[in-house]
From Swiss-Prot:
This is Light-independent protochlorophyllide reductase subunit B. Binds 1 [4Fe-4S] cluster per heterodimer. The cluster is bound at the heterodimer interface by residues from both subunits. Protochlorophyllide reductase is composed of three subunits; ChlL, ChlN and ChlB. Forms a heterotetramer of two ChlB and two ChlN subunits. Its main location: plastid. Its cofactor is [4Fe-4S] cluster. [4Fe-4S] cluster binds at residue 36. GO terms for molecular function: 4 iron, 4 sulfur cluster binding; ATP binding; metal ion binding; oxidoreductase activity, acting on iron-sulfur proteins as donors; oxidoreductase activity, acting on the CH-CH group of donors, iron-sulfur protein as acceptor. It catalyses: chlorophyllide a + oxidized 2[4Fe-4S]-[ferredoxin] + 2 ADP + 2 phosphate = protochlorophyllide a + reduced 2[4Fe-4S]-[ferredoxin] + 2 ATP + 2 H2O.
Amino acid sequence: MKLAHWMYAGPAHIGTLRVASSFKNVHAIMHAPLGDDYFNVMRSMLERERNFTPATASIVDRHVLARGSRKRVVDHIIRKDKEEGPDLIILTPTCTSSILQEDLKNFVDRASIISDCNVIFADVDHYQVNEIQAADRTLEQVVRYYLEKSHTLDQFVTDAPSVNIIGILTLGFHNRHDCRELRRLLKDLDIRINQIIPEGGSVEDPKNLPKARFNLIPYREVGLMTAMYLNKEFGMPYVSTTPMGAVDMAECIRQIKKSLETLAAPILSSKRVDYESYIDGQTRFVSQAAWFSRSIDCQNFTGKETVVFGDATHAASITKILAREMGIRVSCTGTYCKHDAEWFKEQIKDFCDEIIITDDHAEVGDIISRVEPSAIFGTQMERHIGKRLEIPCGVISAPAHIQNFSLGYRPFLGYEGTNQIADLVYNSFALGMEDHLLDIFCGHDTKEIMTKSLSTDISPIWDPESRQELGKIPRFVRDEVKRNTEKFARRKGILNVTVEVMHAAKEALS
């Protein structure tokens, strides 16, 4: 457990609740004190759904601490079974209530005897894992539970090419838009979708998962454990290459073709798809990003530096797109997914100057302040950091705020996703001449000059004459001049920045 003002990944019970509320007709009960039950409000605000979030709290209060939780938890499960009639109830403690060390598994076993629905206890170590790891583990636990419960399974694969999409879930970054784009891609490839879990799926669906010819895991964060379990138990191949960016899109499609050819069962399809021709046609004529990367607009990015930070999937993919497809220098790339650090480093080692693995936002902020990139691509926290440093930021990963749960169609995966990413990259960079013209003609950019830095060091104080002189400098280089002057002043031990200090700093740099 960790006390922090900001966490990139929430506590473990949030991951369990995300999986539970993604399935249809599944109810989650969290054994928690008041204050830990904010998931309902958060999901209702961000997802903007009509339906209520199917999660309630069995509150730990002074009465529970005095007499124990068994009666309250069991009664809560039975009451929700009668009121809601769910197919499954998942009970999870929170990191706070886990301190009590109660045998909740025993409570679940007792409630299972009385209730009509299935009841399981989320088997997650709340002291060791975060939201992402817990979501991955909970999904695998639900799939395993229903497959083992079925006893006799129809393991005959479909005659036509078919796939399971695993890992689309509520509060995921643009997950629903990505799911629509994956549907379009698979339809073009004449591949039938067998199941999509957990988002919108039923808990009765997992027993049909082995009928598909392969599994597609669009994000490493959630779904990989389930795919590995299905591969071990049923020999199902899986594709875990994220179809983000033109190059990885092509690689993902080639892996899909390879996976379909793995099984000995013959494929009966209404049409034969030429995968290489499809890749060529989509890359050249459907995706606008391919020609845009060779245009004069994209060439203007030459020499620009960026910093990328996010979950392992999005940070790695965006880094490769920037460096390999758009020719933009990535000074530093990082992720807060410490558990996937080895894979992350292997993916982006040839595409950036520096790699950082951390869940400390202050450390990320210090790196951004040191590198002084032209643009940042990160989470909501990097957006806040960028605002403080007056560096533009494009949000490419969770955690994100409500503006990144758009009502419009904005996928990151697939060929339409390449267009969205190209737009995001282009619009995230500050165009120097545009800012300069806005300054000259008193455009919308009329805010005061920012003289505070992100660093906790004492910043030199600018006198009125030096502020006025700084205001005469074109805005697209003003921040750089300000930072270089302050660095010079700190190095020389100067506390007050004057016009003379500005000129001295300029001479020292030239």
